[in-house]
C-alpha cells in the first residue's frame, strides 16, 4: 500500500490530497488547502514550501503527483504559478519523494474519462472513486484528482517494469 500526495499548485491557494493506493483502488486519507494570504510573493512561496513539507511529514507519502503549468493569458500569473509549483517540488524532493508531473488534460482523462471534463465533473468522480460523502474544497478536489491520476499511472507502469523514479531527476514527464 503506497501513500500518494497530489498537489494542485497556486501562489494563493495550493491544494493537497493524500490517498492510499491499495492495489485494488485508492482510499482517501486527507486533503486540504495551504492558504498563503496576500503577502509578498517570496513570503507566499515560503508558506507553500513549508505547508507541503508539513503535509509530507504528517502523512508520510512516498510519491507525489503535481500539475504542470498551463499557459495562461496573463504571463505574470503563469510565472507566479510556476514559482509556487517549484516550491512544492523542492519540498517533495527534499523529502526524497518520487515526483511525477501531469497536465490538467491527463488528470481529467484519468479521473473522469475525458480530457474535456469540467471541475464539477472531476469533483463528482473524485467523490465517487474515494467514497466521499461531502464535497472537498475545489483546490483539494483537484489535488485528490492528481493523486488518483498518479496512482493510475503508477499502476499501469509498474507491471511493465517501469518506474517513475527512472527518469532524470526523479521526475517523470508524461
Curated annotation (Swiss-Prot):
KW Methyltransferase (keyword) present: no
Compartment annotation: Cytoplasm
Binding-site positions, Mg(2+) 2: 67
Claim: Metal-binding is one of the keywords in the record: yes
Record: active site: 8, 67, 139
Molecular function per GO: crossover junction DNA endonuclease activity; DNA binding; magnesium ion binding
Cofactor info, note text: Binds 2 Mg(2+) ion per subunit.
UniProt cross-references to PROSITE patterns, sorted A to Z: RUVC (PS01321)
EC number per UniProt: 3.1.21.10
Essential cofactor(s): Mg(2+)
Highest taxon listed in the record's lineage: Bacteria
Subunit details: Homodimer which binds Holliday junction (HJ) DNA. The HJ becomes 2-fold symmetrical on binding to RuvC with unstacked arms; it has a different conformation from HJ DNA in complex with RuvA. In the full resolvosome a probable DNA-RuvA(4)-RuvB(12)-RuvC(2) complex forms which resolves the HJ.
Family statement: Belongs to the RuvC family.
Its job: The RuvA-RuvB-RuvC complex processes Holliday junction (HJ) DNA during genetic recombination and DNA repair. Endonuclease that resolves HJ intermediates. Cleaves cruciform DNA by making single-stranded nicks across the HJ at symmetrical positions within the homologous arms, yielding a 5'-phosphate and a 3'-hydroxyl group; requires a central core of homology in the junction. The consensus cleavage sequence is 5'-(A/T)TT(C/G)-3'. Cleavage occurs on the 3'-side of the TT dinucleotide at the point of strand exchange.
Protein name: Crossover junction endodeoxyribonuclease RuvC
Record organism: Pseudomonas savastanoi pv. phaseolicola (strain 1448A / Race 6)
Amino acid at each position: 500500500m503506497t501513500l500518494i500526495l497530489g498537489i494542485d499548485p497556486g501562489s494563493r491557494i495550493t491544494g493537497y490530497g493524500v490517498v492510499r493506493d491499495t492495489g485494488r483502488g485508492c482510499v482517501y486519507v486527507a486533503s486540504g488547502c495551504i492558504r498563503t494570504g496576500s503577502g509578498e510573493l517570496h513570503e507566499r512561496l515560503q508558506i507553500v514550501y513549508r505547508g507541503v513539507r508539513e503535509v509530507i511529514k504528517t502523512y508520510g507519502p512516498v510519491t507525489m503527483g503535481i500539475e504542470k503549468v498551463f499557459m495562461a493569458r496573463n504571463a505574470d500569473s503563469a510565472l507566479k504559478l510556476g514559482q509556487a509549483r517549484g516550491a512544492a517540488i523542492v519540498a517533495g524532493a527534499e523529502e526524497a519523494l518520487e515526483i511525477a508531473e501531469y497536465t490538467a488534460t491527463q488528470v481529467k482523462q484519468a479521473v473522469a474519462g475525458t480530457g474535456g471534463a469540467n471541475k464539477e465533473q472531476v469533483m463528482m468522480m473524485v467523490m465517487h472513486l474515494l467514497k466521499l460523502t461531502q464535497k472537498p474544497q475545489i483546490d483539494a478536489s483537484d489535488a485528490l484528482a492528481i493523486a488518483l491520476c498518479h496512482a493510475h499511472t503508477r499502476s499501469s507502469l509498474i507491471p511493465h517494469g517501469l518506474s517513475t523514479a527512472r527518469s532524470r531527476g526523479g521526475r517523470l514527464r508524461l
